[in-house]
């Protein structure tokens, strides 16, 4: 009997028989995953089934690149559906506006930082792995900078190992929004 299928994503493994760790998500992140799941099930899945049917109608499947591409896409879509369903089942949805962490940096908090060397100021919100988007100021809970910030409060200095060496950031403000 072949081994059960395994899907990984966001640092977690999903397979039959495994007990999954809780996956922290902000409310926005959970909604984004639900929206993606809905789109995959109601739009993408049907589109790829149609593409497979059209490719089959072309005849010989042994040398049919469109058929192979559609089957590959179908495999990706089905795998992503399983992955998202697993993440949502294991999700712990956290509403940052309801946090009261006493001014400490925790998952979901928004942190204003000042790089000590340059004086540059940045603002990040610490979110789940699937939500991270540096361009929008959303950093993953598992990123080096988030790990350095967790548990600290305004006035503390966090040292982050960056590719160019260690960078020090002073925490200017911590908000739960």
Which residues are covered by each model-predicted region?
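Helix-rich terminal scaffold detector
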Residues: 5-82, 177
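Preference for short coil/turn "hinge" residues that link or interrupt alpha-helices
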Residues: 18, 33, 54, 86-87, ...
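Non-DNA-binding regulatory cores of transcription-related proteins
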Residues: 94-177
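Elongated periplasmic alpha-helical coiled-coil
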Residues: 56, 90-93
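Hydrophobic aliphatic residues
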Residues: 85-88, 149
């Amino acid at each position: 009997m072949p081994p059960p299928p395994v899907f990984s994503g966001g640092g977690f493994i999903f397979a039959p028989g495994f007990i999954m760790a809780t996956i922290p998500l902000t409310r926005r992140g959970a909604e984004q995953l639900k929206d993606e799941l809905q789109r995959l099930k109601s739009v993408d899945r049907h589109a790829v089934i149609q593409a497979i049917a059209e490719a089959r109608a072309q005849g010989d499947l042994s040398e049919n690149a469109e058929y192979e591409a559609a089957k590959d896409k179908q495999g990706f879509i089905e795998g992503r559906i399983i992955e998202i369903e697993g993440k949502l089942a294991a999700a712990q949805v956290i509403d940052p506006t309801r946090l009261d962490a006493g001014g400490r940096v925790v998952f979901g908090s928004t942190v204003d930082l000042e790089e000590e060397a340059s004086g540059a100021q940045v603002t990040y919100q610490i979110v789940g792995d699937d939500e991270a988007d540096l361009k929008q100021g959303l950093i993953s809970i598992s990123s080096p900078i988030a790990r350095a910030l967790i548990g600290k409060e305004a006035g503390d200095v966090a040292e982050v190992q960056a590719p160019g060496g260690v960078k020090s950031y002073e925490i200017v403000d911590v908000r739960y929004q």
